[in-house]
């Protein structure tokens, strides 16, 4: 999406040099890119322009590290206004006590990881804490993902076994995510 700000950024000769250098740097394990000294609006326009102009070379989502989660949310909203698909990979909530805890954050994290595997994002925003944390390997996530189609018959005992193996809890009445019931 071209805006006045991204058009001005793209017209700058220094942006052209940065874009060429960035495109040359894409490889199996690309190095991070840091841009500093820009005011907030210019930094946003630079980021949007780079994300749009390197989409083909990236071959996947860009990882954007923000200092805090509130910055991820703010930047994610901005990128979405420019038409970019973003995911927010939040830090894991650690529970040190044996207590019932909401797994809502875990569900959101798995949703982003699944979206990454499916190519649903142009960029994933996260904090250093979240990026450095352990998570499920892609092959295990793919293996444990169950796709249910309304027009296909289900083997209910096999489905229950797979859901239980993936960490879901069988209950009589579902009242929160992570639970399932058979009728």
Regions found by a protein language model. Give the residues of each.
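ASCE RecA-like P-loop NTPase motor cores
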Residues: 1-183
